């Protein structure tokens, strides 16, 4: 069941990563990018904690937020 929900949450991330982000300029302030971070977090921690970490990271990614290398814990 965990794998099903993880895959379900990865689908919109992959859609964004391979369809939408190709049409927009790179704007993520972090390495790895927020979409790659979300993929890594969901695969490593599953749907609950992975989604929490991904949302937390996306909310930090703005002009007044931090920048630089920020790996999945």
Curated annotation (Swiss-Prot):
Topological category with respect to the lipid bilayer: Peripheral membrane protein
Q: Where are the membrane-spanning stretches?
A: none
Recorded hits in InterPro entries, A to Z, give:
Membr_insert_effic_factor_YidD
A GO cellular component entry from the record: plasma membrane
Q: Where in the cell is it found?
A: Cell inner membrane
Superkingdom, natural source: Bacteria
Keywords, in A-Z order: Cell inner membrane, Cell membrane, Membrane
Look up keyword Translocase and say if it applies: no
Q: What is the recorded function of this protein according to its Swiss-Prot or TrEMBL entry?
A: Could be involved in insertion of integral membrane proteins into the membrane.
Could you tell me which HAMAP family the record lists for this protein? UPF0161_YidD
Q: Which family does it belong to?
A: Belongs to the UPF0161 family.
Spell out the protein name for this chain.
Putative membrane protein insertion efficiency factor
- Origin species, per record, is Parabacteroides distasonis (strain ATCC 8503 / DSM 20701 / CIP 104284 / JCM 5825 / NCTC 11152)
């Amino acid at each position: 069941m965990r794998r099903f929900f993880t895959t379900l949450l990865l689908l919109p991330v992959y859609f964004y990563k391979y369809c939408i982000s190709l049409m927009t300029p790179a704007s993520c302030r972090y390495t790895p990018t927020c979409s790659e971070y979300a993929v890594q977090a969901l695969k490593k921690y599953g749907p609950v904690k992975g989604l929490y970490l991904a949302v937390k990271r996306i909310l930090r990614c703005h002009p007044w937020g931090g920048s630089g290398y920020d790996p999945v814990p």
